[in-house]
Regions:
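Long, domain-scale functional regions
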Residues: 1-326
Length: 326
């Protein structure tokens, strides 16, 4: 009997909800589970993406060590539609009974940074950007430089055995615009990710990234090939699917940390303030999109990586038996 793949282990340890959640409501403290949706791989692989939502306590992974030799702990965001496993940095402190659902504090991030230290053009919403272009990738953002500098000193990069377990997957930095025209500085407009989050209507988060130019990858076979290291940030769609919402606080879902931290999705450009804005998970667990989310604000960094579809997971993802990877 062939050993189960990691993604199969996760599916075996959870019951998949066949319904689609109501994204117009935040999750409650008693609401938790694994749900499914199409992503960028589904059309090719025939496999759904399976995402954790709400007050889950069995999505813990211990994987890799940071530059000081400390074990790194992650929370699984979702199984991607190719069987790889997407997860977000949660620090170097092992979870315990009291932190099994929600772990708070600055330790859940690698530090703080501006998204971009420049903020007076809409291009600066880019994880990478080119001045004068909506979808450019010639210059790394401030936050990308910080993430890359952290990543290359971890065993995720320095240890070849561990490096081989990390997959090159899509990080979506969706710079498309739906309801108006894009401009560098000439007009006010909302990005498509803000339109999808719909303040007054029903949010419609999507795990499909609209443009190849915004699918940040190392290799160009399934994305833009602009990255050096296979690491990025969580998208606002992923945060919404996990239980977050615009303008509604939520301190019971697994992405809540009591900190303000960056999301990879842009929101608006304002000619009044002359600022570009990016989404944040605010310290009350809200999906935030104004005032503090100006791209040169100083906010937390929680890197996201993906485990290969071939990894084996031991454990069951709970605080007392976190998944380990081989």
């Amino acid at each position: 009997d062939l050993e189960k793949k990691g993604w199969q282990t996760i599916l075996a340890n959870n019951t998949v909800n066949e319904t689609t959640p109501d994204f117009s409501k935040v999750t409650t403290a008693s609401e938790k589970g694994l749900y499914k949706a199409d992503d960028d791989y589904t059309a090719t692989t025939g496999m759904k993406s399976y995402y954790f939502r709400g007050a889950v306590d069995n999505n813990w992974v211990k994987f890799g060590k940071d530059s000081t030799g400390k074990d790194i702990y992650w929370r699984i965001i979702r199984i991607n539609g190719d069987g790889s496993i997407r997860m977000i940095y949660t620090g170097t402190t092992a979870p315990k009974e009291s932190t099994k659902v929600v772990m708070t504090g600055e330790g859940t991030q690698i530090g703080k940074s501006a998204f971009n230290s420049n903020n007076n053009r809409s291009e600066y919403v880019g994880y990478m950007y080119t001045v004068g272009q909506q979808y450019g990738t010639s210059t790394s953002s401030t936050i990308k430089i910080a993430i890359d500098n952290w990543y290359k000193k971890t065993t995720l990069w320095t240890n070849l055995e561990i490096k081989a377990l990390v997959a090159d997957e899509i990080y979506c930095n969706d710079r498309s615009v739906i309801n108006s025209a894009w401009s560098s500085t000439g007009s006010d407009f909302d990005y498509a990710s803000l339109t999808r989050m719909s303040l007054n209507g029903k949010p419609s988060p999507s795990l499909k990234c609209t443009n190849t130019s915004d699918k940040f990858t190392v290799d160009s076979s399934n994305g833009n090939g602009a990255l050096t290291y296979p690491v990025g940030l969580i998208s606002v769609d992923e945060v919404a699917m996990a239980g977050g919402k615009l303008a509604t606080s939520n301190s019971s879902y697994y992405l809540y940390t009591g900190q303000d931290y960056w999301i990879s999705s842009p929101t608006t450009y304002s000619t009044t303030t002359k600022y570009a804005y990016e989404f944040l998970v605010y310290n009350v667990g809200i999906i935030g999109y104004n005032k503090d989310s100006n791209v040169n604000g100083l906010n937390g960094i929680r890197p996201v990586i993906n485990l290969s579809s071939d990894v084996i997971l031991s454990g069951d993802g709970t605080y007392s038996n976190v998944y380990t990877v081989s």
